[in-house]
């Protein structure tokens, strides 16, 4: 038994978190107060990255941090992944400039290619097809529109909906404000490159 104890459950898999706490079939149903966290401010990242690089005798251009922050819309995991790679690419007493970003991006995608292929291997053909279409368009509004379906040679609105359902459930694709996108920025770029 616990008294005067608070628990914090956190995670970026929104579907899973919602299911745990807001599904009547789950034991934690309506037992929490939900709070969404907003992105850490860009200035905080600029200061933090500059300090971390400097502590190890390296430097990073403020503009490089701004570019990375905007690429990932303030999403911490992706920013940290990119900053870690940029740090590894930067020699001691050197300055990491925006030119390093493409190299870091390519390195991350190459390092994760096996994971991306495993995801694709586990998808049905129609799921792959809709995933490729989303990757090409990046942010998709009107995913069941005839224009989107024709442009990507998809079968029908109902087949798009059927293929999309498991992609959403597994957080491979997310819907933000009526726009669909691939959740993992690196996976999205990988798909756009190869297909």
Give residue spans per PLM region:
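Non-catalytic, well-ordered alpha-helical scaffold segments
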Residues: 11, 66, 76-80, 84, ...
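Amphipathic alpha-helical "lid/sensor" segments that cap RecA-like P-loop NTPase cores
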Residues: 46, 50-115, 125
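Conserved AAA+ ATPase "SRH/arginine-finger" region at the nucleotide-binding site
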Residues: 33-44
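Short glycine/proline- and charge-enriched loop/turn segments
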Residues: 24-32
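Conserved RecA-like P-loop NTPase ATPase core
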Residues: 37, 68, 130
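C-terminal leucine-rich, beta-strand-based interaction scaffolds used for sensing/assembly
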Residues: 114-195
